[in-house]
Each structure stands twice: as C-alpha cells, then as structure tokens.
C-alpha cells in the first residue's frame, strides 16, 4: 500500500502554493492585521477563481467533489502563508453539513452558489462547544434569538450562517436586518472571529442532529 499523495493532489498543492506565494507578503499581512480588508478580498477572489470554494461540493452541484484530505492540504498552505482566506466554515464545514440525503433541498439551493463564489457561509457553533449560562441562542416558533460568539468566516457579510441550538443545526439567511455581525479582537489578526446577534431570525432546520454536528467539527479541526 502506498502512502503518498497522488499526482493530482500534488498538482493541487503546487497550484495553491504558487498562488499564495505570489499574493502573500509581509506588507499585505500587516495591512490585514491593521483592519484593512483589501488583502483578504483579493485572496478570496483568487480562491473563487481557482474553484477552491467548491472543493467539497459534489460535481453534480458545480463543485469538484473531492474530499477532506484535499481540503486539509489546502488548509496547510493557508497556514503556511498566513493567508486570510475564508475556508474552514465556508468551504469545508458547510458543504459537509448540507451534502447528505436528509438535507437535499438546502444542498441544491446553496452549494452551487458556494461553489461558484456567489455565496459565503459563516459558521457559528460555539453554542455547542462552550455554552454560556448568561447568554446564548434560543429558538421559538422557528425563529432564533440571542448571541453567538467566535463565529468563523462571518466577517465579510455572509449570505447564510450555520448555527446550533440544543444539539440541532440551523441555517439562517442574512438577507434581513435582524442580524448584527461585529468582529471580535483575537491574538491572530489575520483570522477574524465574529460575534453574531440574532433578533428573531427565521431559521431552516438542518437534519442530522448531534452526529452531524460532531462530523463538521471534526472536519473543521482537521
């Protein structure tokens, strides 16, 4: 048995490495750390043009249909160059979350748009990992209210947000004025975390429960 990257995987790594090498420099990283978004917008545009956003999206929905290994190889390059790319939430966790028979309608609606770069998905699941007693999220009659912190890929006006309440996943569309998103200061200024405030926002339940939550968390950690 051969434990090595295939020729296609090596080509993928080489292509991403060359792209980030030409884009990422110390001046750009400093501007990102100071709060400028020009650099992150540039990197995300290049990712979209290379079709990387749809890496885990099935081919039938406009993506590449590749797997978590290929996603981790790209993640390695993002870390190597400290690139402020929208990746883990948008391009890894969300496709895995929606790409199953139980959520076929949501997948067909949103995954093609993630693949072509016309949609950004943020992920706010800190509620599952470390719920705060004094604040958090509640759902009543299909509407979510409350505050979720440490959301990822949510700093550039996402179109949808994947969140969790009481071991259930939900998808919230942000095309309304009932959501407030603000950036949280962290040690790594190139990797922005966000606080999201929901004001009675309509939510679509994502079927899968605790098993699916654990699955996307594992994928994000890889």
Regions found by a protein language model. Name each.
Residues 116-128:
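A short, Trp-centered hydrophobic/proline-enriched beta-strand micro-motif
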Residues 27-49:
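Short secondary-structure junction/hinge motifs that connect adjacent elements
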Residues 49-108, 116, 152-158:
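Internal helix-loop-helix
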Residues 124, 147-179, 184:
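A short core secondary-structure module
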Residues 20, 74, 103, 123, ...:
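Residue-level signal for inorganic ion chemistry
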Residues 117-119, 133, 156-157, 166, ...:
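A generic structural signal for well-ordered coil/turn residues at beta-strand boundaries
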Residues 131-145:
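Cytochrome P450 C-terminal beta-domain/meander region
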Residues 2-8, 12, 180-222:
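Glycine-rich beta->alpha junctions and the first turn(s) of the following alpha-helix
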């Amino acid at each position: 048995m051969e434990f090595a990257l295939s020729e296609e995987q090596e080509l993928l790594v080489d292509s991403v490495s060359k792209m980030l090498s030409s884009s990422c420099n110390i001046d750009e990283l400093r501007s990102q750390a100071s709060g400028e978004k020009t650099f992150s917008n540039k990197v995300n545009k290049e990712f979209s043009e290379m079709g990387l956003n749809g890496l885990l999206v099935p081919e039938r929905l406009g993506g590449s249909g590749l797997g978590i290994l290929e996603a981790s190889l790209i993640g390695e390059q993002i870390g190597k160059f400290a690139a402020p790319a929208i990746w883990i939430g948008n391009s890894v966790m969300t496709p895995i979350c929606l790409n199953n028979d139980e959520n076929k309608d949501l997948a067909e609606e949103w995954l093609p748009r993630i693949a072509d770069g016309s949609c950004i998905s943020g992920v706010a699941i800190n509620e599952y990992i470390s719920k705060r007693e004094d604040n958090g999220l509640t759902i009543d009659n299909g509407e979510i209210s409350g505050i979720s912190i440490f959301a990822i890929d949510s700093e550039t006006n996402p179109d949808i947000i994947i969140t969790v309440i009481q071991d259930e996943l939900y998808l919230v569309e942000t095309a309304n004025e009932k959501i407030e998103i603000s950036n949280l200061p962290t040690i790594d200024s190139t990797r922005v975390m966000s606080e999201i405030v929901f004001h009675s926002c309509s939510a679509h339940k994502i079927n899968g429960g605790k098993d699916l939550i654990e699955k996307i968390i594992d994928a994000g950690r890889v």
